[in-house]
Amino acid sequence: MSQPESYPLLSRIGSPSDLRELPAAELPALAGELRAFLLESVSSTGGHLASNLGTVELTIALHYVFNTPDDRLVWDVGHQSYPHKILTGRREAMPGLRKKGGLAGFPKRAESPYDTFGVGHSSTSISAALGMALAARQLGEDRHAVAIIGDGAMTAGMAFEALNHAGDQKANLLVVLNDNEMSISPNVGAMNNYLARLLSGKVYSTVREGSKRVLDHMPPMREFMRRAEEHMKGMIVPGTLFEELGFNYYGPIDGHDLPSLVKTLKNLRALPGPRLLHVVTRKGHGYAPAEQDPCGYHGVGQFDPSQGLAAGKTPSSPSYTQVFGQWLCDMAEADPRLVGITPAMREGSGLVEFSQRFPERYHDVGIAEQHALTVAAGMACDGLKPVVAIYSTFLQRAYDQLIHDIAIQNLPVLLAIDRAGVVGPDGPTHAGSFDLSYLRCVPNLTVMAPADEDECRRMLSTGFHLDGPAAVRYPRGKGPGAALDPGLDTLPVGKAQLRRKGRGVALLAFGAVLPAALAAAEPLDATVVNMRFVKPLDEALVREMAEGHDLLVTLEDNVVAGGAGSAVAESLAVQGITVPLLHLGLPDRFQEHGSREELLSEAGLDAEGILAAVRARLNDVPSRSGRDDCLSAPTRVISK
């Protein structure tokens, strides 16, 4: 990282109070240094880049005008909060960004008093800031609450619920709408079109402001014209939605014009009630490659800023996301009923090629997970075969729709659940720790977890051809490199696969933990079963394993509570079988950020951790099968 002399202004900012000591004339130069530091830092560590480059001036202006942390800034989603972290005393910690034990990639209350609300998912900021504004009013405290939300996040229903409540409460709340025409994928829908129309509403703005200046000198006319203005709005521009919700709307203004931002925010700080400031920014601003390709530079690994993101090497094996994307195109060619649905995650979920080849069958519904599942249910009612591509963590937002709109009606909707289990650097807000637990209890739902890429493809075909709802959950990144069969073959529903015959110990592996189970099985001489289906469970094979082994060990990259291991225990209890059990999975705590490998090792789900846990448990288990040698064998390191 460069020395302080490379950033003479930025190096003087240890907190926002230092920032507020600067003359306003120096703020543009500070913005240049902050943007350069961001590029140097994120290109070294990886992380979210384009969104942060786009919020440099806005972040400086907010901390310059408002008395943070007494005044509350609430960032929506939070991936654009790196400038905020840098200006609030965490500049020197940036080399540890998103690494185990280092800075979180999102605002985190435990990390800094300036992080007033923990975020990671979209569209929560207005609700949280409103809650803070209402708390201040009830407690008699004189402070401001500011929500900073993107135009993509504004498409979600929760944002409108909060706007509706805030307008009704006449709360002292400022909402800053950061309009960069992007979330992760390009924004879609009526809200995006509405904001575009506002941007072109220059005539209305000119007439309105000019009239106010004149009418200020004619008090008897002011009230008449106020009422007339409400009718004029609809004649000059589309109705100002935010004002109808009880907000005073200001803008749009240039989000990269620091003097204008500071002046406007100072004026708005002095006004009471609900206010909405519409600022227009450019994702990737100040770094040409990111401006030209904001999607590509949304989340980056390490790269050379002078070269930009190099064309990626062809991987030795595809990621699970790529396997899904190819399967979707293949199945779409085979079955014209297939439709693909995503809640604003076209790139992340692997739907780019599908959207290009089958545009009439591709539906990006915006950041609207609840709507995504219910619109899929409606399609399924009338003969289509919907496939919803969604991250595990975001599926949590649509749990009621899964039960009420899909499962109760037993509709043939396939959920392709990406980023299941341990995810890594994005931390607890993006971990897929809970899906097996909350899915397997839903009646009518078939739940599958592939152990490799080819099995993922076969499970997707299996779920697609079922007459009811199905879910296939797969992890982030690449699998073990299994050869892919180009066909669209299915698997027998509810049948596990015996992968290794051993004695004494049976390892029942669900999904991506299978390679680690196979590695741990060698020194144990353990039996290994690839369980494949969490629901319906292969109860016959579970019974066979229980009757022929001293210890059953369940393995899953899901929380132990209520997960696949619990399904095995429940099955044995129903069958009246008593056998020693060991459940290995994610512990009863939220995953912190770190690499996937580090987090799996910490949870004891790598080969070494499995081996150690099994050996410790065997000390308390009597032998029925002569497996004493696995206890006395020296522990050895198993390569990952």
UniProtKB/Swiss-Prot annotation:
Pfam families: DXP_synthase_N (PF13292), Transket_pyr (PF02779), Transketolase_C (PF02780). The keyword Transferase applies. Disulfide bonds: none annotated. Keywords: Isoprene biosynthesis, Magnesium, Metal-binding, Thiamine biosynthesis, Thiamine pyrophosphate, Transferase. Mg(2+) binds at D151, N180. Gene3D superfamilies: 3.40.50.920, 3.40.50.970. One of its GO terms (cellular component) is cytosol. It catalyses: D-glyceraldehyde 3-phosphate + pyruvate + H(+) = 1-deoxy-D-xylulose 5-phosphate + CO2. Its EC number is 2.2.1.7. One of its GO terms (molecular function) is thiamine pyrophosphate binding. Thiamine diphosphate binds at H79, G120, H121, S122, G152, A153, N180, Y287, E369. Its cofactor is Mg(2+); thiamine diphosphate. The keyword Transferase applies. NCBIfam families: dxs, PRK05444.2-2. Homodimer. HAMAP family: DXP_synth. This is 1-deoxy-D-xylulose-5-phosphate synthase. It comes from Thioalkalivibrio sulfidiphilus (strain HL-EbGR7). The gene is dxs.
